[in-house]
């Protein structure tokens, strides 16, 4: 049971403390595709305002998932195509191959490591 909807728990924690991803405010947003059932692992989405006043779309994912980049690009296009795209996931799940995919988008995106238990976030460089 503790493995279900971990990405939603991550979104909840970050929406309560948006500074973890460099945001002033965040709220849950509709994903570009919905989960078909409770066991299906699908990233979830929030939108808001960054600490610099820019509109942002944040994608929450747990585990290494190359498909998260396409999911995020679709979500940004659906919510606000001009928004900055941020992927929030546990630091251990940020891998070079996936960050390169995010950098290759027409409007690049970045990853932020969010380690919920330690309530720390570090931008991936």
Residue ranges: model-predicted function:
Residues 1-125:
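Charged, terminal alpha-helix-loop-beta segments
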